[in-house]
Design a protein with these regions (language model features):
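N-terminal propeptides
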Residues: 1-180
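Long, low-hydrophobicity ectodomains and other hydrophilic envelope-associated domains
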Residues: 160-211
Length: 213
């Protein structure tokens, strides 16, 4: 943030996040990513847009970023929404410059790449702009668990399981699942055993019926 180039220095989590936010379109001068409080502003925005999603433990931007962390943050950037600014202009009167700075606005995507990453939301994700042949699709694995399949053109990159909201070993009451997930209304959930569909189960408050093996 001080403008110096130190190629042999370590890269902190905050510094790397600043680079990624810049790639998403955030303007350092407008967002306060320079000066004494730059790291606070960077960390706040990075966590707000989910660049640390999937990180084990808490984000510590003062520490040097590991290779694994760098890969995770860069991967999350692919899925993050880009931003742009409107009506940025300046006028100089008698040697004094007045600048009108707008706030960051999510970039719209009205093209054919909308929906390549995540749902079709009308917003431009980083990969939808710069990696137009990269796609993720919701699928299920051999055990009917939710997963994501990544492809580049016609080539399959891989299928990866989604992280479960809750995991149990052995039997569990449907009412306990309801409580553990902080649900507010009952749900008729699809139920599979080793990939084979069973009867739907009512996940609702106080249901003592057990599922699992």
């Amino acid at each position: 943030a001080d403008g110096t180039f130190r190629p042999t220095g370590t890269l902190s989590g905050n510094a790397f996040m600043k680079m990624l936010l810049g790639a998403l379109g955030y303007d350092s001068s407008i967002e306060g990513y320079t000066g004494p409080n730059w790291s606070i502003n960077v960390a706040k925005r990075a966590l707000n847009v989910g660049l640390e999603d999937g990180l084990e433990g808490s984000f510590n931007g003062t520490k040097a970023v590991t290779r694994e962390e760098a890969c995770l943050y860069a991967f999350n950037t692919l899925k993050a929404t880009m931003v742009e600014y409107e009506n940025n202009n300046s006028v100089t009167v008698n040697g004094i410059t007045f600048t009108n700075k707008s706030t960051a606005k999510e970039m719209a995507n009205t093209g054919k790449t909308d929906g390549n990453i995540g749902s079709k939301d009308g917003k431009m994700q980083f990969a939808e702009k710069y990696f137009t042949d990269l796609k993720d699709n919701d699928v299920t694995n051999d055990f009917a668990q939710p997963a994501i399949k990544w492809t580049l053109k016609a080539e399959k990159i891989g299928t990866y399981d989604k992280t479960a909201d809750q995991t149990y070993t052995g039997e569990v009451k449907l009412g306990d699942i309801y409580s553990d997930l902080n649900m507010s209304s009952k749900d008729s959930a699809e139920y599979y055993i080793d990939g084979t569909a069973q009867d739907n189960q009512d996940v609702k408050k106080g249901n003592d019926k057990k599922v699992g093996v």
